[in-house]
């Protein structure tokens, strides 16, 4: 994923929230994404772990979700 991609993020609520990637930082353990959400237009950092599906918080929004 890259800057300006439309994504959904897993937060403490049950519904994934839609946002836009503002920045990407790569680390050995995974990738951090700064994502602008409606409530947080300046962005919030989310970390996707490399080796864990449970540690995946940011996902690219699919075409079916865009409809």
From Swiss-Prot:
It comes from the Bacteria. Pfam families: DSRB. InterPro entries: Dextransucrase_DSRB. HAMAP family: DsrB (MF_01549). Belongs to the DsrB family. This is Protein DsrB.
């Amino acid at each position: 994923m890259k800057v300006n991609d439309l994504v959904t993020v897993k937060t403490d609520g049950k519904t994934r929230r839609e946002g836009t990637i503002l920045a990407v930082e790569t680390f050995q353990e995974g990738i951090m994404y700064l994502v602008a959400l409606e409530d947080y237009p300046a962005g919030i950092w989310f970390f996707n772990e490399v080796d864990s599906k449970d540690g995946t918080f940011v996902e690219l929004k699919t075409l079916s979700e865009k409809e």
